[in-house]
């Protein structure tokens, strides 16, 4: 397992979190035909996975933005580190190819990280790690370098707190998520919302996202703080309607384009802030 350890150490150093190697068989078996075909086309001769977590926990002070969206967009931060890791791995293992993924991926990244031994899968679908709880982003590198490793993912203790405290009742007993009732999904949704969905956002105090299921999770008692600079610097915990007033889509992108809350544009955020204001005025 020497090459597995060396490869994982390189990735862990780049992601400033944790990493582990695994064989791809069990992960590929869980994928649909289209995603499996895409993965094998992108990495011909796929024989190994290097899975990693990017911790993002900073602080739990007030605000109307979800914790994951307060620093730089994790896609940008993760991509930079994965590219750096791929370059280092290509030098360490010449002749092999390495391709990084973070969120935009044919692979089930949470399952892959759990299969690699980095944590358990919570009933809210998030990876539960020992050091950082669920305050992590999952990433991975697929390679034709033969790698061993992987074990049946640990099971969530199923205390039921996430299910019972979910504002919209989006989590079912068997761990399925109803997107139409998930506050985080609704704050990102474009187009019309039902009256109940609008009320859910208005009562939440959140302009983007929802951290309720994470805040109550026992795995998140005392998580370590991230060491990733992009998640520590230029933190923005809230947005106001005044800050968005009069901005065109282009101006909004120029001002907030490096933030995770910007990918859906300014319209959903304006709507959410208006719903928060309406709820406050009705009290």
What do these predicted regions represent?
Residues 254, 262-280:
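Long, compositionally biased charged/polar accessory segments in the mid-to-C-terminal portions
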Residues 186, 190-208, 239-262:
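Short Fe-S-cluster ligation motifs
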């Amino acid at each position: 397992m020497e090459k597995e350890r060396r490869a994982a150490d390189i990735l862990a150093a780049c992601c400033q979190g944790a990493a582990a190697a695994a064989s791809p068989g069990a992960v590929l078996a869980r994928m649909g035909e289209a995603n499996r075909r895409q993965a094998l086309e992108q990495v011909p001769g796929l024989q190994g996975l290097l899975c990693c977590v990017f911790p993002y926990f900073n602080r739990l002070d007030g605000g109307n933005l979800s914790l994951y969206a307060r620093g730089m967009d994790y896609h940008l931060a993760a991509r930079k580190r994965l590219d750096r890791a791929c370059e280092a791995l290509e030098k360490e293992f010449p002749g092999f190819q390495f391709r990084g993924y973070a969120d935009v991926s044919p692979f089930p990244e949470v399952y892959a990280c759990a299969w690699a031994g980095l944590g358990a899968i919570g009933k809210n679908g998030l990876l539960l790690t020992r050091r950082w709880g669920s305050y992590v982003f999952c990433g991975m590198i697929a390679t034709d370098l033969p790698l061993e490793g992987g074990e049946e993912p640990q099971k969530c203790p199923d205390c039921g707190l996430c299910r019972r405290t979910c504002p919209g009742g989006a989590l079912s007993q068997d761990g399925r998520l109803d997107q139409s009732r998930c506050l985080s999904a609704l704050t990102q949704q474009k187009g019309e919302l039902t009256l109940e969905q609008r009320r859910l956002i208005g009562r939440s105090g959140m302009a983007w996202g929802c951290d309720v299921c994470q805040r109550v999770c026992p795995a998140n008692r005392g998580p370590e703080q991230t060491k990733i600079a992009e998640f520590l610097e230029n933190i923005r915990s809230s947005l106001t309607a005044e800050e968005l007033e009069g901005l065109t889509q282009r101006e909004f992108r120029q001002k907030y384009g490096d933030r995770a809350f910007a990918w859906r544009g300014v319209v959903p955020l304006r709507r959410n802030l208006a719903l928060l204001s309406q709820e406050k005025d009705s009290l």
